[in-house]
């Protein structure tokens, strides 16, 4: 099986490291990859936002299976495009990736479907959020909506930290 891993970070390096051990892995490619990944997979410097170029690569190299590491290609619908072209993928559809992309979407979906979740308030401007923070007990958790590369959550111990 010819396998393509999308990404260039530690997560993708770990994926490549594990995948290349499989007896089912005939060829392993990574886009764009990194110096470390190039030691275990054939890397190609394709922008992960360029869905058409990735699709063309898959067709040219007869890729059987794609594993997508980073959130952005998932939220931009790469899985949907590849699957619609009969290329198997590991990763959620664009709609499914909304659970990762938007904390507000996920909280509202949980509430609509009676899935237990923590209390929350959403704000579209700093001033309203600050007024609310003046009325709550600490510690409290503040989360940015949208992708934040794993850095969108802050646990605050007091109002000064919340600001």
Locations of regions flagged by a protein language model:
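Active-site nucleotide/adenylate-binding loops and adjacent lid/helix of ATP-dependent enzymes
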Residues: 4-5, 99-163
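ATP-binding N-terminal substructure of ATP-dependent carboxylate-amine bond-forming enzymes
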Residues: 1-94
């Amino acid at each position: 099986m010819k396998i393509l891993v999308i990404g260039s970070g530690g997560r993708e390096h770990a994926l490549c490291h594990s995948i290349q051990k499989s007896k089912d892995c005939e060829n392993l490619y990574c886009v764009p990859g990194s110096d470390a990944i190039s030691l275990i997979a054939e890397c190609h410097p394709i922008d992960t936002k360029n869905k058409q170029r990735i699709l063309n690569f898959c067709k040219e190299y007869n890729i059987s299976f794609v594993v997508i590491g980073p959130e952005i290609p998932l939220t931009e619908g790469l899985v949907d495009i590849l699957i619609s072209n009969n290329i198997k993928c590991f990763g959620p559809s664009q709609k499914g990736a909304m659970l990762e992309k938007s904390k507000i979407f996920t909280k509202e979906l949980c509430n609509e479907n009676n899935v237990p979740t923590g209390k929350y308030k959403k704000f579209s401007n700093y001033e309203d959020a600050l007024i609310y923070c003046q009325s709550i007990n600490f510690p409290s958790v503040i989360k940015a909506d949208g992708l934040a590369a794993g850095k969108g959550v802050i646990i605050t111990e007091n109002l000064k930290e919340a600001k």
